[in-house]
Each structure stands twice: as C-alpha cells, then as structure tokens.
Amino acid sequence: LISRKLKITAIIASVFIVLMSAAYGAFYIWNKNYKFNNNYVWQPLEDVQSTLNLKDSYNVIVAGTDPEGITAALSAARNGMRVLLVEARDRNMLGGLLTEGGLNTLDLNYSPEQPQLLSSLRQPDFLNKGIFQEWFDQIEGSSFDTNTAANIFYRMVRSEPNIDLLMNVKELVPLTEQSTGDYTTITGMSITKEDGTTVQISTRSIIDATQDADIAAAAGVPYSIGRQDIGDGKSKMVSTLVFKLSGVTDEVWQKFREREGTGVDKMSAWGYGDARKYESSNPQHIKIRSLNIGRQNDDTILINTMQIFGVDPLDPISVKKGLEIGRKEAPLIVDFLKKNYDEFAGLKYAGTADELYVRESRHIYGEYRLTLADVMENRDHWDAIGYGSYDIDIQSTSVGNPGTIMLSPIQYGVPFRSLVPLKVDGLLVVGRAASFDTIPHGSARVVPLGMAEGEAAGAAVKLAYIHKESFRELSTSEERASELRKMLENQGMDLKVHRFEQPDYMEHKDYKGLLAAASMYMTSGNYNNDGWELDKGMNPERFLSKLKRMQAMFPEAYTGSADQALANMENAVTLPLTLDQAAYMLCLAMGSSETETSLEQALAHLQTQNFISADTLVGIADKNNLTNGDAFMLIRDVVEYYSGVVFD
C-alpha cells in the first residue's frame, strides 16, 4: 500500500514537473517572440462634430481640448453641470498635445507601491486613477496610437449629454466685472466662432485648460514666464517637434529590443543616447537628444527627440517659425538614423506632428504656488486633489545647456489652491500653467497629473454651485477641501498617500542648505537622488558660480562682485574653499568693498550681523576644506537672514 502511494505521488510530481516545464517553456517562447508584437487594430479618426445650438448660459465653460480640459468637462458634466467645452486652436481631433502634438508616449506617475505577484504580466499601479485611468485602460499602453486616443476622448465627451462641444473658434475673450478691491469676477465668455460671428455666453465659472493659460492671462491673472522666478527671465524649456516613420513591423520592433542600451515594451522604446552625435544643419536652433519612441497601430512610430531652441510659445510668428525649421530638419534626422542604425534602415520618413510640444510658458500665481520643497520632501497637503511622482525633468534651455534631472520624488500632493488664480474669481487653471514654481513644474507639468487637476476642477464647479461660494472661498476651507476630496474619491480617484521611506538626503546634516541651493538651481540629484555630493569638497571657482546664481535670483539684494576674491588666486578650481574665503566672497557679493571688509574680517562681520547662524558654523568639520554641504548652508543662511527669503 505504501509502495502504491509512493508511485502515485511520484507520478503526480512527474506530471506537475512536466506541466510546469511546458508552461515555463511556453512563457519563455511567448516572452521572447510574441510579447512585444502589436496586435491592436488601427482605427480611422472619427469626425468631430461641434454643437449646432449653443445655449445662452452654462454652469462652466472649459477652454481647451487637451486632456486636462476634456477631463475637467467630463467631471463637471458627470456632476450634473451644464458644460461648454470650447477649442480656440485649429484642430480636427480631441487630445491636444497627445494627439495633435504627436506626444504619444506618456510621462506617468507611478505609485510607490507596485504589484509584486506576476508583476511582469500586470499593469503598473498609477497615482490618482479616476478619469485618467478610465481613458488609459482603453488605449494601447505606455504609448498609444493617436487615432485611438483621440477617438476615445471624443466618445467619452460625446457620451455626456451635459457637454456641448465647440471646435475651431477664432477667439475667446473672458468677460469680467469688478468685485472687491482689485479683484474681478468672471461673468461669461465672448466667443468668435469659425464663421466669424461673435456670441456672448454667460457663466460664473471658467476652467482654463489652454496650454499657456491664455484665458487667465487675458482676464488679468498675474504670472511668471519660463524661469523668471529663479532670475532667468529669458529662458524656458526647449520645444519639440515630433516626427513619424513608417514600416515598423513586429520584426523591426524586435530589432529595437535587441539594441544594446535600449529599453522596450510592447508600445514604447527609449534609448539611443549616442544619437546626440547628430550634426544639425541649424546648430544654433536645433539638436537632438536620446530617442523616445511611441508605436502606433499602422506600423508607424512617433519619435520625440528634436529640440528646437528660441521658440516663444506666446508669439504665433515664433511658433510658426519653429514648426518650419523643425519640418526642414526632420528628414535630415531620419537620414542620420537610417545610416547609423540597422533597424532604421528600411523605414521611411512620414511627416511631423501638426503642433509643437511646448513644455513651458506661463506659470500663474495662485492661492498657493507649488515649491521645490513640496516635491523634494514628498509633502501632502490638506487640500491635495492629485499626486505626482514623475522626475523633475528640466529640459534644455539653450544649445549649450543639456538640461537637468533635479530629483525623483516618491509622492507629493498638488493643492487645490494651486488651481485658484490670484486677482480673478470664478476661474480655475489646470495643466502645466497652473501655480507651480518653474523647478517643480518640471515634474508637475506632465499630462496625467494635469488630468487629475482637471477632474478636481470639474468637481469643484459642482461644490461651489451647491454652497453658492466662489472657488477662492472653497480654497480657504478645510471642510470644503474634505468635501471635494470625498467627491473625487466617490467618482473613482485614488487620493491615498502610500507608505514609503523618505529619501536619504533629508537626513543629511546639511539638508536645509541643499534645499536652498536646489531651489536656486545650484545643484541637482539625478534620477537616483544621489548626485548632490554634499560631502564632496567645494572649490573657490565653483563657489563663485553658486554666488552668481544667487545674485541672478536676487539682483537687488546682491549688487557686488565676488570675482575679485579670485583675481590673484591660482588653481581656484583645485584648491579647497576655506571658511574665511567663503565669508569674504559672500560679503563681496552683498556689496561690501574690500576696504570695508577684508578676508580676515569677513567672517566676524557676517557673525556680528547675524547673517550666519551658530549652528551652521558648528556643523563645519574642517574650516580649511569646506564641503558642498557646508557651502550650501552658508548661502542658505545669508539668503534667509540678509535677503529674508526662506525655502523651507
């Protein structure tokens, strides 16, 4: 009997092993040969129809058919509000940047907690979910076919009876009336339609989902442009023109996968860092970076690599010129790729996107402005209506500037207050032009987070309607914030803050100095948050460059020049920075002349004036060899105690 049981057990074990081996073999073959095949079916673009009968008034007018605007309109409509969704650009599909701009690869906000069991077979977990997740579940993946995306957006809008859609209008002008003090209140929108006729539509609420906050600017909302808030008023992130190649079969896609140093999934590929060697025909205005490749369902790919410098997003003539030089360069870039990479050899150039990918223009000032500290410390907010985790990716601002990965956050909150602009009531701003400082905007600008903002804005219209309160009044109330968050959770958003450990840099003794330095764009941490080098030695030459950055940010406070401190110094790049030298250079930058403050007197002067704290001095281990962290702490103290600016 025992022998029989052993035989049965052995047979069962053998069968199990055979089945598992077969399953593993099948999985191996599938993973190697079929997992990355594109089995999706291409679909023609649906014809977008505008409403024929505009109403005299709506609960809310949403300006802009980028994803943020679509989400805002859907959210408001599903909450029972009558919505007019209106587009002032010449577009024939919904989706804006993702469709007309050809940006078919998403910058995603991944949750800190991801599925562990069979993770390679499961979809990643994203922050916020809600309407973004509803749309994402219907597209192909991390990249998508632009027709699919546009059609899904249109079907979602068309399915809501509370939404009227009006495309291709010639002009949108917000109508306002004077309210308290220097504040105005939205009363409606003047719309010049495609046929040239003008109508005035009444509303008490407008959601500005235009890429550049055009409605907010026209209504009188204050804003900064580009990197103006860090003392660089002429710079903004580079623009891109996405271009298309055809002939990308499953076999070609497999070759992308085999390319060393390239990452590939079913719909996206990224890498080709050495493509930067491309010699531009217009080197003052165009270069390329590594390739971001998004696959489509008709054997085409869209490539985000071209960087076009000198485009002013707020000047239509400049934008037109940017498109022209980009379209001239695109075929040349394709020729370069075909000659240098075998997998590109058989592909054909198939044109460019209809619009530029503009990363940065206006940043409005709202009831709260998202700061680098918010992102760096992964802060939550009592009125958070969405969460981000995308890298602070600051793209090039000039041909000689390669751009910066400031850091990789884990999960930070975007307050509702950042959607509520100063000076104008009845208005919300969503998307990359919301109330974000330029550095954290490098993370907060991504579309999925903008869609969370749009969903919150749409729900806020209903909340304001119920309580007969303005958006500004909502933004001051923790009770209303709790109501809004509950509404959003009830309609499918995930506003949970996940469990995670804060990054190591926050435990460093010089963290406050690091935060100040990073906020002034003096340092960066890269993708792994390990590039700060706080314990590495600082030299006089590099310290001088940090002081010049400080002076650029606060030109009225720091009118002197620290250059003279290095005038007779040899090897300023290799010599260690001493505490006396640092203090002397700080005094010179503040405007003190050599006759007033000498090298020997500078430190005592700063201490006497309480411009440097005792704790900072105690934290310096070697006063003859300052570290980066030591130097950042000195700068941080002077900026706080002399300029009155705190970055905490």
State what each model feature region is.
Residues I2-V60, N151:
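Extreme N-terminal leader/targeting segments of oxidoreductases
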Residues I11, Y24-Y40, S50, L97, ...:
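Flavin (FAD/FMN)-binding glycine-rich loop and adjacent Rossmann-like elements that form
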Residues I29-N33, Q49-T51, S57, S75, ...:
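Conserved N-terminal/central alpha/beta ligand/cofactor-binding core
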Residues D56-Y58, D195-S205:
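Core beta-strand elements of the Rossmann-like FAD/NAD(P) dinucleotide-binding domain
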Residues A63-P67:
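Glycine-rich Rossmann-fold phosphate-binding loop(s) that bind the pyrophosphate
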Residues Q200-A216:
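Short hydrophobic core segments
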Residues Y521-R542, R549, M553-D648:
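Terminal recognition/anchoring or ligand-binding modules at protein termini
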